[in-house]
Regions:
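Short acidic capping loops at alpha-helix termini that bridge into adjacent secondary structure
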Residues: 21-22, 53-57, 110-115
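Hinge/beta->alpha junction and helix N-cap segments in small-molecule ligand-binding domains
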Residues: 1-10, 26-74, 89-97, 119-121, ...
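Short acidic donor-binding loop at the edge of a beta-strand
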Residues: 14, 22, 149
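Flexible loop/turn connectors
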Residues: 74-185
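Residues that mark the start of a beta-strand
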Residues: 20-22, 86-87
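Alpha-helical recognition/docking segments in bacterial nutrient-uptake
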Residues: 1-13, 17, 79-80, 84
């Protein structure tokens, strides 16, 4: 399993180091463990540096999964509520892509007017316009670790042994591309 908290801490730290203080968030659905963990990473970092998270700049995906359409709708809502945010951290790359498209249609240029960060590093994120800064989680490594654990369980079962519960976390990595830059100066 990817260390979601570490991933969002890296993402918000990147925005913070670029001078962003008015950061909008599109959270994942509450029912997903990933969403809870990612939000915890944001809160932990914000508390550590004294960054105020404005409740008006926090929206949540309502369905079980993110959709491009909902990403657009939530970004439109953020722009209506509080258009002065300088950065947006999205639950995933699909939502980030929708946010970029919506902001561009509204006349806000990414990253000049608003930096955007996603999460997952799906293959197409490098080809978005602009290429998306995102948190990479290695699905290959997660898959191979899962396969190793299954093999261990099979061997243990064949040998009539029990194994203690095991929990492995895969470290994510922030991939900085062209959707982020220094916060605009007012």
């Amino acid at each position: 399993m990817v260390d979601n908290e570490a991933g969002t801490r890296q993402a918000i730290q990147h925005l913070y180091e670029l001078g962003h203080r008015r950061i909008a968030f599109i959270k994942g659905p509450k029912i997903l463990v990933d969403s809870v963990q990612r939000w915890r990473g944001i809160e932990t970092f914000a508390q550590a540096v004294g960054l105020k998270v404005d409740a008006k700049l926090v929206l949540e995906i309502k369905g079980r999964n993110s959709t491009y359409a909902e990403g657009c709708q939530l970004t439109e809502e953020l722009l209506r509520r509080c258009p002065d945010f300088t950065a947006l951290l999205a639950f995933d790359d699909l939502t980030a892509c929708a946010a970029i498209r919506t902001m561009t249609k509204a006349g806000r240029l990414v990253p000049r007017d608003c930096s955007v960060v996603g999460f997952d590093d799906v293959p197409s994120s490098a080809f978005y316009n602009p290429p998306l800064t995102t948190v990479h989680q290695s699905l290959e490594l997660q898959g191979s670790l899962s396969a190793e654990m299954v093999e261990e369980l099979i061997r243990a079962s064949a040998e009539k042994r029990t194994l203690p519960p095991k929990h492995r976390k895969v470290s994510p990595k922030l991939v900085v591309r062209e959707s982020t830059c220094e916060a605009p100066h007012s």
